[in-house]
Amino acid sequence: MPRNHPSLALVAAVLLPFTAAGEVVCALGSASSYNAYRDERPSRDAMQLAGQVNQALTPICRPRCPEIALFRNATAPNVMLIAGDGQAKIVYAPQFFTTVFDAYGDAAIVALIAHELGHAVDETAPASWIKRSWSPELRADAWAACALAKVRPTPSGLREALAAIAKYPPAAQPGWNARLPALRVGFTECGGDGSQFDRAAAGKGN
């Protein structure tokens, strides 16, 4: 993935700059103050973590993987997905990623990016193990946990990633007890160990 291009692509493609007005598909915070004109290229660290999500999900969604641009913007509502006119972008607030990293580590940022990306993957390449009765947010949770399983964080990294997912829910998200089953399904269907997930969800793991 080129470090100097502001895009997260789940297929090998060069994206044009995102110009569509778009609709907020999911935001982990209020999007009322977002100013798209302040979008900037992502940091190298953010691109590297987005690359982990890319590597985790590409084998699953290929050949129907979505193409997503990644931007940073201080006015963004923590992190969000915007889509419209056949284009999509994930926008994150750099101060939010700094806060998450300091409190929860790299795996937490991977999980939050994967949740946003999961909305797009679910539209273009739905998996048979995803229950269509789940809400869009639960399906995105399942994809986030799938990515975590593929990234294979340490037990403590998984615990902290789940803690971050719980700490920063989308506005439309159901309660944590409703989210856990979808997260567990995504984790185990993508090769993760169910007992490890259960320990992490219970706040255990070293």
What are these regions (language model features)?
Residues 1-9:
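Bacterial N-terminal signal peptides that target proteins for export
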Residues 22-98, 128, 138, 149-206:
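C-terminal capping/extension segments of zinc metalloprotease domains
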Residues 16-21:
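N-terminal signal peptide c-region/cleavage motif recognized by signal peptidases
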Residues 117-133, 147, 152:
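Catalytic Zn2+-binding segment of zinc metalloproteases
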Residues 84-92, 109-118:
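Short coil-to-beta-strand
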Residues 96-111, 130-132:
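Short pre-active-site segment immediately N-terminal to the catalytic Zn-binding motif
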Residues 48, 52, 108, 112, ...:
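Extracytoplasmic/secreted proteins, especially bacterial periplasmic and envelope-associated proteins
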